[in-house]
Regions:
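P-loop (Walker A) phosphate-binding loop of NTP-binding proteins
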Residues: 3-5
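ATP-binding Walker
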Residues: 8
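Walker A/P-loop
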Residues: 11
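The feature captures the helix immediately C-terminal to the Walker
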Residues: 14-15
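Post-Walker A helix-loop "phosphate-sensing" segment adjacent to the P-loop in P-loop NTPases
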Residues: 18-27
Length: 194
């Protein structure tokens, strides 16, 4: 799992990770929010109505789901189960609340936390994105402060102070995890002790 506050650069890191490791399966989240400019159905999210989302949630169709800033987001269970059954590695890009739910349901899931170099830089990124009002940005920054406190819950942290460097570090983490799996548990990934 790749998690971190809104605006930290998760989407950009995921794009670079998938370019470097094209065999990695990306879990596409479902959401009730409207698409942002340059977001495509089925590529960035599955954009669904509230009724359809609620049906999926009630039927156990999500590995996790949450209300975030007045919209619902969820990780559909079936595509992940199918990919894992076929022996493929799955990447889930998610918020902190969702990562906690997934970890509770799937304790073997490996959690990478992406953090900004500072809250000031995070605010700059959110404003540059141009898709939220001032009120929404203030809400996202308040939530980010809470989420940053969750960093010790994650297996490893990557500071996104330079996108290319952060993306390269995440690629290296995935490579090490794959080697650990292949080599029977031997890894040089420095993990936090929980």
């Amino acid at each position: 799992m790749l998690a971190g506050p809104s605006g930290v650069g998760k989407v950009a890191i995921v794009a670079r990770l998938l370019a470097a490791l094209p065999d990695l399966e990306l879990s596409i989240s479902a959401t009730t929010r409207q698409p942002r400019p340059r977001e495509d159905e089925g590529r960035h999210y599955h954009f669904v109505g509230r009724g359809k989302f609620d049906e999926m949630a009630e039927a156990g169709g999500f590995l996790e789901w949450a209300d975030i800033f007045g919209e619902r987001y969820g990780t559909p269970r079936e595509p992940i189960d199918r990919a894992l059954a076929e022996g493929r590695d799955v990447l889930v890009e998610i918020d902190v609340q969702g990562a906690r739910q997934v970890k509770a349901a799937e304790p073997e899931a490996y959690m990478v936390f992406i953090t900004p170099p500072s809250l000031q830089e995070l605010e700059r990124r959110l404003r540059t994105r141009g898709s939220e009002t001032d009120h929404q940005i203030r809400g996202r920054l308040a939530k980010a402060s809470e989420e940053l406190a969750a960093e010790p819950e994650f297996d490893v942290t990557v500071v996104n102070d330079d996108l290319e460097t952060a993306a390269r570090e995440v690629v290296e983490i995935v490579d090490r995890l794959r080697r650990r799996t292949i080599n029977g548990g031997h890894s040089r990934v420095k993990e936090r002790k929980h």
